[in-house]
């Protein structure tokens, strides 16, 4: 019985050591990928398209608002055959931003009252 217990402890220790090494390898690869993604994001952030401007050249270039990124929305104007694309914010996200702003203001008032 003691042998089985010692063998089990040995296997658990060996497994945890090998999985820790694999996780370290994955973490290093993830860090490298993350750094390259951050560099790309910083480069892309400088060229964002403001809200209500044409985004047909790059549909993923809309600027971020306080909480959410704008969405490139395409439509056909009335009586026109050409497609027009502009950066816009969906209404539900607009309302969520307004609610978050009001909650933040209310939280500040509560902090003043009790803080």
From Swiss-Prot:
Q: Which residues form the propeptide?
A: 21-44
**Signal peptide annotation:** 1-20
State its location(s): Secreted
Tissues and organs where the protein is expressed, per its UniProt entry: Expressed by the venom gland.
**Key word Secreted present in the record?**
yes
Q: Which GO terms describe its molecular function?
A: toxin activity
Q: Which InterPro entries match?
A: Spider_toxin_CSTX_knottin, Spider_toxin_CSTX_Knottin_CS
List the record's Gene Ontology CC terms alphabetically. extracellular region
**Keyword annotations from UniProtKB, A to Z:** Disulfide bond, Knottin, Secreted, Signal, Toxin
Q: Which Pfam families match?
A: Toxin_35 (PF10530)
Q: What is known of its domains?
A: The presence of a 'disulfide through disulfide knot' structurally defines this protein as a knottin.
Per the record, the similarity remark reads: Belongs to the neurotoxin 19 (CSTX) family. 01 subfamily.
Protein name, per record: U3-lycotoxin-Ls1j
Q: Which organism is it from?
A: Lycosa singoriensis
């Amino acid at each position: 019985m003691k042998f089985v217990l010692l063998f089990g402890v040995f296997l658990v220790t060996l497994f945890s050591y090998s999985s820790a090494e694999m996780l370290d390898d994955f973490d290093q690869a993830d860090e490298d990928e993350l750094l390259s993604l951050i560099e790309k994001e910083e480069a892309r952030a400088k060229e964002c398209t403001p809200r209500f401007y044409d985004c047909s050249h790059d549909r993923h270039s809309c600027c971020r608002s306080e909480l959410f990124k704008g969405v490139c929305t395409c439509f056909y104007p009335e009586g026109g055959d050409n497609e027009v694309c502009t950066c816009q914010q969906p209404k539900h996200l607009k309302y969520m931003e307004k609610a978050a702003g009001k909650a933040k203001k209310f939280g500040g008032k509560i902090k003043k009252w009790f803080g």
